[in-house]
Amino acid sequence: MRHRNGLRKLNRTSSHRLAMFRNLTNSLLEHEIIKTTLPKAKELRRVVEPVITLGKNPTLASKRLAFDRLRNRENVVKIFSELGPRYQNRNGGYLRILKCGFRKGDNAPMAIVELLDRSEANNDIVNIAE
């Protein structure tokens, strides 16, 4: 029985899924806004939000856990120096997922994923909605 197995497999092997979500997470943390397909965006929320929650408690163990999930030192530093303090008073729900039409070519539903309360320095949304 498949009770409570809600993971989207996205037609990928487990190692491919892990690498894909690690890359999406690092891109989202670096740019604070990305454009991807809607199923990937919904599954990305399950990966990113616990990592940001780790940043609210800056212990050595949580830094090691964050590095284990991301494998990117710059993003780990950003989580604990910027994002943790930014979301200190927010209990989850750090992402906004906006539907933005369908992709030309395969008609896949697309979405924009962004961090809430993102800084004005990261408003480099030039052609994100095309």
Curated annotation (Swiss-Prot):
Pfam families for this protein: Ribosomal_L17 (PF01196)
Alphabetical UniProt keywords: Ribonucleoprotein, Ribosomal protein
Gene3D superfamilies tied to this protein: Ribosomal protein L17
Any one cellular-component term (Gene Ontology): cytosolic large ribosomal subunit
GO annotation (BP), single: translation
Cystine pairs: none
Family of this protein: Belongs to the bacterial ribosomal protein bL17 family.
Database matches in HAMAP family: Ribosomal_bL17 (MF_01368)
Subunit: Part of the 50S ribosomal subunit. Contacts protein L32.
Protein name: Large ribosomal subunit protein bL17
Source organism phylogeny: Bacteria, Pseudomonadati, Pseudomonadota, Betaproteobacteria, Nitrosomonadales
